[in-house]
Amino acid sequence: MAKRRMFSIEIMESDAFCSLPASAQSLYFHLCMNADDEGFVDKWKSILRYLGVKRGMLDFLINAGYVIVFGEDVLLIADWRRHNTIRLDRYSKSSYVHLLNTLDVLPNGRYIKAFGDFLATQDK
C-alpha cells in the first residue's frame, strides 16, 4: 500500500465535484487514499463505517461517475490515472488487475466500463 497519493486539481476543484455533499467528497478522498496502485478499493465498507457516512454518499459518487462498482466487494476510482502516475519501481500489482480487461480508458485517462466496439464506432 502506498503511503502517498496525488489528486488532480482539475477534478477536485471542478464544479461537478464541489457540488457533491461534503461527506461524499470526504468519502472520495478516503477511497483514493486507500486504493491500490490501479485505483481499486476493496475495503470501502470499512471506510464508510469509520467515517460514519451512509451508503447513499457512495451512491452520489457512483451516479456522478467518480466510482465504478464491481459486484459487492470492489470499487474502482474512475479518474485514478488522472490523479496518480506510479513509477514502475514503486508499482505493486493489483489483486484485481483482471478487472481492467472489462474497462476502456478514455484519452484523458478516465476508466469507463467497456461497451465492446461502441467507443470505436463513435469515433468514426
Language model features with spans:
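Short recognition helix of helix-turn-helix/winged-helix DNA-binding domains
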Residues: 1-38, 77
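Winged-helix/helix-turn-helix nucleic-acid-interaction surface
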Residues: 1-11, 51-124
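Short secondary-structure capping micro-motifs at structural edges
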Residues: 15, 45-46, 62-65
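Short, well-structured alpha-helical interface segments that form or flank functional binding sites
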Residues: 22-26, 42, 53-59
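Generic detector of isolated residues embedded in canonical secondary-structure elements
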Residues: 26-27, 46, 60, 76
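Short acidic, hydrophobic short linear motifs in intrinsically disordered regions
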Residues: 35-51
